[in-house]
Amino acid sequence: MEKFTIYTGTTVPLMNDNIDTDQILPKQFLKLIDKKGFGKYLMYAWRYLDNQYTEDPDFVFNRPEYRKATILITGDNFGAGSSREHAAWALADYGFKVVIAGSFGDIHYNNELNNGMLPIVQPLEVRQALANLKPTDQVTVDLEQQKIFSPVGEFSFDIDGEWKHKLLNGLDDIGITLLYEDLIAEYEKNRPSYWQ
């Protein structure tokens, strides 16, 4: 997993509440098993007018000024519903690094973290201010300081200390296990065999 320390990008507002994992990534795309390639299907029912991937020009992700946005500003209860990790894969593959919401579905919140994204909880007034930024305005998220820096203000956020450590050091669960590889090998070498 890549380290996440300080990230600067532009925002895209999608202020709907209760966007569930089926809206983020519909069930018909769950048969793919590689994390890559899901970005095309992100918000499928909203982004496209038909099954030929004709873009809906009114959907915010399809507007030219927001196409390169990497920070999503959204409503309450983002990622509710089923526990499909594919929804987080779709967000990451599309290019999002940060999702700022009023709240998150618990499992989806952890899925974002497990995939190197930073989910941040902020109150409505902060999200509304960020949603009203110009598409070219830069927003910086500093994980070490736990702060968001933007043209409309500076905002603090909370994150669990263990997750903060993992993101700052680019460690997923496998990476943490590998930190103890020598100890694991030593244990296995000295462990009595019960099958002889």
From Swiss-Prot:
Pathway: Amino-acid biosynthesis; L-leucine biosynthesis; L-leucine from 3-methyl-2-oxobutanoate: step 2/4. GO terms for cellular component: 3-isopropylmalate dehydratase complex. The keyword Transmembrane does not apply. GO terms for biological process: L-leucine biosynthetic process. Its EC number is 4.2.1.33. InterPro entries: 3-IsopropMal_deHydase_ssu (IPR004431), Aconitase/3IPM_dehydase_swvl (IPR015928), AconitaseA/IPMdHydase_ssu_swvl (IPR000573), IPMI_Swivel (IPR033940), LeuD (IPR050075). Keywords: Amino-acid biosynthesis, Branched-chain amino acid biosynthesis, Leucine biosynthesis, Lyase. NCBIfam families: leuD, PRK01641.1. This is 3-isopropylmalate dehydratase small subunit. It comes from Streptococcus gordonii (strain Challis / ATCC 35105 / BCRC 15272 / CH1 / DL1 / V288).
